[in-house]
Amino acid sequence: KQLDIEGIPPIYSIEENEDGLEIIEEYLACQTLSDILDEHTFSNLEAYQIIRQLCIILDVLHQQDPQIIHRDIKPENIFYDGKQVYLFDFDIARNYIENQKRDTTVLGSQGYAAPEQFGFYQTDIRSDIYSLGVLYHVLLTNKLPRDYDLQGIEKRIIDKMIAIDPQGRYQDVKE
C-alpha cells in the first residue's frame, strides 16, 4: 500500500471481510493481457516491450527491504492499455524471509507458479522470474511452454527463465 511505482495502480484500502482480505485498487479502463490474448498473440516486439516493463516494475519490488515477491504473475493479473502495463493482484504477494527453507503456504496459479511455490523450497525473486518466463511464452504463442516450442533467442531466454532449479534461472530481472 505504501509503494508509489509506475505500473502498479495505487491501493486505496485493504479491508478484512469474511473471505479474508480485500484490496481496493484504482480502476483502470483497459483490458487484461488475458482478454487481449483471447483475440490474438503479440508480436515479438510487443511481447518484449511488455516483459521489459514488467521487469522494471518487478525490479522495484525486488529492491525493497525486505524484497517483495508477487508470486502470481499471469495474464489475468496484468492490465495493458497498448503502451503501459499495470501489475495487479497482490493477494498472495509476500516479503522475502531470509534463511527460511520453504514457504509455509502453497499458493500460485497452475501453469504459471514456479515449482518452489508448491512447497519444495522458499519462494524468492527467481519465482517471479519463472512466472515471467511462462508469461513471455504465452504472449508469443498463446500456449503454456509445455504445449509449444519456440525457436531462436526467445526460446533461449524463456528456457533460462523457466528452469526448474532456481539456480539455473536468471538471478534477478536486470539480467
Language-model segments: residues:
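Activation-segment/catalytic-loop signature of the eukaryotic protein kinase fold
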Residues: 14
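Conserved short submotifs of the Hanks-type protein kinase catalytic core
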Residues: 18-32
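Catalytic-loop of the protein kinase fold
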Residues: 62-80
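Conserved activation segment of eukaryotic-like protein kinases, specifically the C-terminal portion
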Residues: 102-116
